[in-house]
Amino acid sequence: MINLFLLKYKTAFSTFLKPFAYLSLILSVCFYSIQAQAFPVFAQQAYENPREATGRIVCANCHLAQKPVEIEVPQAVLPDTVFEAVVEVPYDLSLQQVTGNGTKGPLNVGAVVILPEGFTLAPKDRISSELKEKTKGLIITPYNEANPNILVVGPVPGKDHQKLVFPVLSPNPAENKNVHFIKYPVYVGANRGRGQVNPTGEKSNNTVYTSPIDGQIVKLEKSDNVTSFSIKSKTGDIITVKVPFGPDILVKEGQTLVADQQLTNDPNVGGFGQVETEIVLQSPARVKGLIAFFFTVILAQILLVLKKKQFEKVQLAEMNF
């Protein structure tokens, strides 16, 4: 009797928990999908520094198409000053990209700004209300603890953030002996849209797929999220190519192929770009000295003019006499 009661209780309890199990699974999948789009995280986990020795920013390893990007910073800044670094990521807002599940959706954007050593993200209490409004909706973070001068942001909706504003705090050489009053380079990389290569090295569903060999498609099979091509080579070997949903299929079963022939179109509408500029950390003493020099020159000019007029009056008086 007790065993029967326990069996019924166990069955009822399992039935009660089943919807929660499904809900948990759905939430975990959704959470994973959201995290899978967080492309700056991949670079942060794989590279200690996003700029390689060749000068290339590592985002280009996954975002293969080249697109323009612009950076705007002041020509010069004083020490311990908050200023704006504005990254522009232009693209056609009417474009739609292939999302992770193969459907079409809007593009997102992201950027990395590699500042000189000592330059950091401005503290919240140093940011003006106007600058806070410009950075609304952006979560800007240092690349890692070892590189607080490297700032990353994204992915964020591109329709709202074609201009990414970074609030930056300049260093003070009086407090940091590694910083000097000189001209420094600033490197910027920015992308719009998803990458063509996953961090694992596999192709994403946002790129073109080609045939690896000469042969014939003997079988073309579609499942829930993958299209499988069975290609028979001239030697009789069967090679299977799996294409995730997203790209449009350009071939059909029975078709003869040559190596590197496209099996799909290229759905990518985004791309990555990098650019560099320069900024001067200006000494206040130099600025004061320059102002004093200009004042001295102007004062000398005024005195010279007054002296000249006085001399002319003396000459005129002597002539009249």
UniProtKB/Swiss-Prot annotation:
Signal peptide positions (record): 1-38
Domain of life according to the entry: Eukaryota
Cofactor annotation: heme
Transmembrane stretches, start-end: 287-306
Keyword annotations of the record: Chloroplast, Electron transport, Heme, Iron, Membrane, Metal-binding, Photosynthesis, Plastid, Signal, Thylakoid, Transmembrane, Transmembrane helix, Transport
Example GO BP: photosynthesis
Protein location: Plastid, Chloroplast thylakoid membrane
This protein's GO CC annotations: chloroplast thylakoid membrane
Membrane topology: Single-pass membrane protein
Keyword Repeat: no
UniProt key word Transferase: no
Chief location: plastid
Task performed by this protein: Component of the cytochrome b6-f complex, which mediates electron transfer between photosystem II (PSII) and photosystem I (PSI), cyclic electron flow around PSI, and state transitions.
Record HAMAP family: Cytb6_f_cytF
Homology family: Belongs to the cytochrome f family.
Subunit structure: The 4 large subunits of the cytochrome b6-f complex are cytochrome b6, subunit IV (17 kDa polypeptide, petD), cytochrome f and the Rieske protein, while the 4 small subunits are PetG, PetL, PetM and PetN. The complex functions as a dimer.
Name of this protein: Cytochrome f
Source organism phylogeny: Eukaryota, Cryptophyceae, Pyrenomonadales, Geminigeraceae, Guillardia
